[in-house]
């Protein structure tokens, strides 16, 4: 059963990714890669779907559509808020923002989205699970175990690289700020030297800054630069005391990280 639920988790994470991307096409008219990871999966969907499936299979076996809907609304809201809070505290970043949506709480959750997840819960329990789970269980046990192990390996590798990219990006931006301060000290010290023109020092210092920043920020990930750009492109923005700086660099990195 473990392999069955692992495969189910990954498939529902993929379905959640498709749902998010299609929803963005409907709302904005353009494709937008969604999710925290580089791969086409959104684990929060797979996790909630799996938790709901286990809950209504082993905890509450006699349930009604109304109870499924209400539990899905509350559970998804709690999970979405906690995940958003954790990611924001861990990386000072956010991947979705409901601040412009009605009845939102700190931009992390909103009533319309939670109601939508409630409807999704009904679709999963009554329409998807009765067909998807039996199909997975029909796969021979050995093959099912192999597939689940491959999926876990790919998922773990993606998660590890994603965490490394985000941590490296934030660290390098903070280090670059120190370099900027060093160059500003150089400029301030230089203008007191009357033997040379002030403009030449400004140009010299900022040339060094541009070369240093380009090398330090735009090419930090080697052969994984394309992978890193894909991860960073999904970050919607940063919050906190360094938000302005991080958002400025993020916008430039999205377009120039491979240059």
Predicted segments, located by residue:
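Aromatic-rich, lipid-facing transmembrane alpha helices and their immediate juxtamembrane interface loops
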Residues: 1-259
